[in-house]
């Protein structure tokens, strides 16, 4: 079976890996420059910064079996067991990270797959020589017996306009929180303490990470995620104004250090506010998956991708 997967985040990559292992012909397309989606790591000079997902946890036995393989392969390691120093950073649940950054996980999963980045899916329509045709913005097209679409739901709606597929009303009303992220490289140690992560430390930020303490950066570099309220209120403000305000608000975490360089990254569709009750949704050999189905965490998205792949394999 020929399957095209739209989106090279963890949901799409997990689905593709599962299908390929079962002998199917799979192509993964993504508009980004590299696979990963929110498994995103950026390098600025000598600094390495995770600027999307900061870590992940494991609850489900199926996902745990995959994570154990990633650990054995040297791709993933435990970061800590909590971010509250009052409990000695230990609440019993490991937080995992990529050994050299979260994007390592995506690169590991993409290895051996036909992943085509810088490829923007434009529309889905019934095919002439296959069940479906995925049209690309450069005028080319990919034929498929089945499609797995893992991009955020607003982008999915746009793709399906020409496919004559009707989505449930509640799914079409799904909204997303936004996240504005400040990346700052420093000349000396920050005011963030071990293990290098702070959740909801103040009224501006939902997460602050020191990537050097975290263990992925040779230079001191902070990732600061503004919370949904701040991000929404300042989304359309002039970029320089947002940058300067975030730097001001970050001062308690920068401490006595000097900012060598800094930049802002914006995630418009960061976190779905409602979750579909099933791990995937399917109609006419088109399967929707991603964090809006499995839950707004790395584990949920991964399990959603596996669920989508399993569905297709069962109906063949």
Language model: regions and residue ranges:
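Core beta-strand elements of the Rossmann-like FAD/NAD(P) dinucleotide-binding domain
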Residues: 1, 137-146
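Glycine-rich FAD pyrophosphate-binding loop
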Residues: 20-44
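N-terminal FAD cofactor-binding segment of flavoenzymes
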Residues: 41-81
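Central helical "cap/lid" subdomain
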Residues: 36, 144-195, 257
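Flavin (FAD/FMN) cofactor-binding core of flavoprotein oxidoreductases
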Residues: 244-245, 250-284
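N-terminal Rossmann-like FAD-binding beta1-loop-alpha1 element of flavoenzymes
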Residues: 2-29, 309-313
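Active-site substrate-recognition segment that forms the wall
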Residues: 183-234, 245, 249, 253-254
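A conserved short coil-to-beta-strand element within the FAD-binding core of flavoproteins
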Residues: 117-132
């Amino acid at each position: 079976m020929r399957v095209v997967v739209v989106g090279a985040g963890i949901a799409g990559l997990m689905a593709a890996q599962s299908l390929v292992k079962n002998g199917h012909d799979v192509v993964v397309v993504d508009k980004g420059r590299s696979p990963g989606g929110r498994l995103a790591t950026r390098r600025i000079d000598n600094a390495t910064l995770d600027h999307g997902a900061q870590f992940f946890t494991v609850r489900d036995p199926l996902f745990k079996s995959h994570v154990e393989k990633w650990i054995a392969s040297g791709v993933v390691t435990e970061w800590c067991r909590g971010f509250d120093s009052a409990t000695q950073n230990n609440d019993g649940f490991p937080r995992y990270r990529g050994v050299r950054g979260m994007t390592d996980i995506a690169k590991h999963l993409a290895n051996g797959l036909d992943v085509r980045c810088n490829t923007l899916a434009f529309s889905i329509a019934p095919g002439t020589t296959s069940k479906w045709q995925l049209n690309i913005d450069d005028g080319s097209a990919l034929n498929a017996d089945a499609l797995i679409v893992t991009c955020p739901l607003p982008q999915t709606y746009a793709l399906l306009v020409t496919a004559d597929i009707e989505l449930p009303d509640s799914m079409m009303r799904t909204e997303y929180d936004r996240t504005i992220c400040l990346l700052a490289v420093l000349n000396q140690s920050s005011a963030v303490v071990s293990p290098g992560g702070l959740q909801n430390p103040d009224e501006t930020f939902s997460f602050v990470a020191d990537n050097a303490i975290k263990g992925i950066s040779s230079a001191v570099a902070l990732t600061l995620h503004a919370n949904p309220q701040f991000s929404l209120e300042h989304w359309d403000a002039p970029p320089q104004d947002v940058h300067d305000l975030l730097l001001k608000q970050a001062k308690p975490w920068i401490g006595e250090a000097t900012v060598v360089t800094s930049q802002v990254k914006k995630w418009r569709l960061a976190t779905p506010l409602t979750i579909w009750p099933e791990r995937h949704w399917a109609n006419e050999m088109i399967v929707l998956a991603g964090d809006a189905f499995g839950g707004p965490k790395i584990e949920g998205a991964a399990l959603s991708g596996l669920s989508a792949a399993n569905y297709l394999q069962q109906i063949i």
